[in-house]
Amino acid sequence: MQIELAKTAASRPATAFAIVANVVDWPEIISSIKSIEVLTPGPIRAGTRLREDRIIFGRGLTQELEIATIERPHRLRLLANHPDLHYELDHVIDAVYGGGCRMMLIFRSRPATPTGRALQPLMSPFMEITLRDELERDLPDLATAISRHGPN
């Protein structure tokens, strides 16, 4: 399953990326995220592990994420490997002609078990609607934080 969403913001890509890549501030930016704990010592980089507490589907969820890729000022990719489902979430930022930037959230998932693979055709439509709703709440929160910093 893949879900893609995009939104523009009145900011330079480098400024937007700095806000998106500062994952420790996400609880102040993204309303569904209640806390982020950095589990890997040192600066945020590829390989950094995080523990995220968020409200999803109306319930609390704690998950461990890994920063798989940081390509400044363009892309931040997070990975989650759950026993039943593996997923990736890309935050991609591009310049927009005339100024500003476009931020995309790209969610990709794949079942991790034979049972999950068998159920995927039945579950995907329901999961996609619900996950899209969740991402559609996160994206404006990020865009608002980015726009607060203006077109600098």
Predicted ranges, named:
Residues 1-45, 141, 147, 152:
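Hydrophobic ligand-binding cavity/cleft-lining segments
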Residues 8, 68-69, 94-95:
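Well-ordered beta-strand positions
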Residues 11, 58, 109-113:
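Beta-strand elements of well-folded, non-transmembrane domains
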Residues 15, 38-39, 64-65, 106, ...:
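Short, flexible segments with low predicted structural confidence
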Residues 38-88, 100-102, 137-152:
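Glycine-rich portal/gate segments that line the openings of hydrophobic small-molecule binding cavities
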Residues 79-133, 137, 142:
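Beta-strand/loop substructures that line and gate deep hydrophobic ligand-binding cavities in soluble
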